[in-house]
Amino acid sequence: MNSEPVMPIMSDKQKEATSLIVEQLAQSGIKLVASLPDDWIAPLISAVDKDERFKHVPVNREESAIGLCSGAYFGGIPSLALMGASGLMTCIYAITKINYSYHIPLFLFATLRGVIGDPRPHHIANGLYLTKLLDSISLPFFLVEERKSIERIPAAFKHCQAMNRPEVVIFTEAVLLGEA
């Protein structure tokens, strides 16, 4: 049995967008990526997994990614928690309890699900409430709605570290597909 991760089939535009995101992560100094699968970020997860510049740790719960990345901070390892919108929404307690209480920076990537174009009705609540929820707990985020915004990733990571607080980069499907 081959343990190599299978790279999802991607268009050239999607490969280009994924590569750009990966390069921005490397430029940020990220060394560890903890991820929970989401179909929109599967190509990004696969690319990070195959890239020797990163240690990729798949997790089975979003809170595990929060704990792993928070612990990595104390070990001096720049990290990223990578998950879908619903996963991020389930970890709000862990983020406020651990990262807010102890001023631990946490850099997160999430998808913006449940918006126009997302065919899955079970993600509607994500589209309605994700950014409002983040605003309600004063968790800084920026929405990547066009390709040029990908280049802001290193600045967002630096901001997160300077504040000693979490920060989220939220991607639209169009950006992840290389269509925006």
Regions found by a protein language model. Name each.
Residues 2-180:
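Thiamine diphosphate
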